[in-house]
Amino acid sequence: MAKTTRSTGTKTQDEIKADGLKEKMISVNRVTKVVKGGRILGFAALTVVGDGKGGIGMGKGKSREVPLAVQKAMDEARRGMIKINLINGTLHHPIIGRHGAARVYMQPASEGTGIIAGGPMRAIFEVMGVHNILAKCLGSTNPYNIVRATLNGLDKIQTPAMIAAKRGKSIDEITGA
């Protein structure tokens, strides 16, 4: 089933495969390579894959035909999946992710808020199982850079247990409980 996102108007494709992973196509670009004999037409696809429990992977694929480019991107996304620790369908703390000129601000939200994020970020949060989050793109709006910045920020998230271990304290001292 294909649907159009509200913010960018680009087509996203949402599928759940037999292995339980959700796939979303973020963008497909038509690219050309100029050679002596003329132009060679091709396509570049950007996709994300998630397990709905905090696992997320991003891939890009290039080919002369759209389905091959999308398949290559999906395969790359499956191979490069990372695990993000979530708490009740949201993040542990606010974070800023950066990649190139793109900056992404992400903040945990209370139950019932939903996914308040634009374009490629919304696709990432949907496939990885985040249900409540506030997010904002700052700087570049290039989908590839936004996806990389979002993954950079998500990768930097630390759980209270990680912070407690680093500081040599108990989790109760960190959380204030």
UniProtKB/Swiss-Prot annotation:
Record flagged with keyword Cytoplasm: no
GO biological process assignments: translation
Gene3D superfamilies per the UniProt record, alphabetical: 3.30.160.20, 3.30.230.10
Keywords for this protein: Ribonucleoprotein, Ribosomal protein, RNA-binding, rRNA-binding
Domain of life: Bacteria
GO molecular function: rRNA binding; structural constituent of ribosome
Stretches assigned to the S5 DRBM domain: 21-84
A Pfam family assignment: Ribosomal_S5_C
One GO location term (cellular component): small ribosomal subunit
Function noted in UniProt: With S4 and S12 plays an important role in translational accuracy.
Family under the similarity heading: Belongs to the universal ribosomal protein uS5 family.
Subunit structure: Part of the 30S ribosomal subunit. Contacts proteins S4 and S8.
NCBIfam families found in the cross-reference section: rpsE_bact
Free-text note regarding domains: The N-terminal domain interacts with the head of the 30S subunit; the C-terminal domain interacts with the body and contacts protein S4. The interaction surface between S4 and S5 is involved in control of translational fidelity.
Protein name (database record): Small ribosomal subunit protein uS5
Organism: Nitrosomonas eutropha (strain DSM 101675 / C91 / Nm57)
